[in-house]
Amino acid sequence: MCIRDRGKTGVVGLIRGRDGGQSGRSLGLRADMDALPMQELNSFAHASKTPGKMHACGHDGHTTMLLAAAQHLARQRDFDGTVVLIFQPAEELGGGAHAMIEDGLFERFPVDAVFGTHNWPGMAVGDIALSSGPVMASTNEFKIVIQGRGCHGAMPHMGIDPVPVACQVVQGFQTIISLSLIHISEPTRQAE
């Protein structure tokens, strides 16, 4: 079964195990699938064929891994319960997961747990990293408004110049403790 339009462009697929899903157990596997508004500048065989769109963060790989898992599970069905395949849009620009949840993803397809994956180009081929809880960092947007006050050029002491204040804010960001700490631990190495 394949359901489209969860979170506008999300897709959900179901694969039932050898028991036809009767055990009631359900596991979600999730991959992000959005492209970024960037021009691909390489000539790899897997390069984007759509001008101005690029899977720069490996989302094409994430989607491929989930499709490969789906193919394997559909062929083997050597499990009990149901696997819910979640193809999430808008991961990079935010809101895709939230939109899918708001559209009733987990009411329609309740799961006991959800697992996701992310490539990590710096890791050796064949190694995997596992962790309970959050693994990758996220970005959050915020807005700072620095408001000055104009004055006559002969009386600068009567005004507030926002430029030096903005410079201090930018320099202050560089001292945030997160820039001094490693935000992720070393990955667990696979046994040889």
Question: For each predicted feature, which ranges?
Answer:
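Single conserved hydrophobic/aromatic residue that forms the stacking wall/gate
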Residues: 1-3, 182-192
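Acidic/His- and Gly-rich active-site-bordering loop/insert found
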Residues: 4-55, 60, 64-67, 71-79
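Residues within well-formed alpha-helices
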Residues: 12, 68-69, 95-96, 165, ...
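Structured core elements
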Residues: 12-14, 28-30, 115-116, 143-145, ...
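Histidine/acidic-residue-rich, glycine-tolerant segments that coordinate divalent metal ions
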Residues: 36-38, 42-54, 60-61, 73, ...
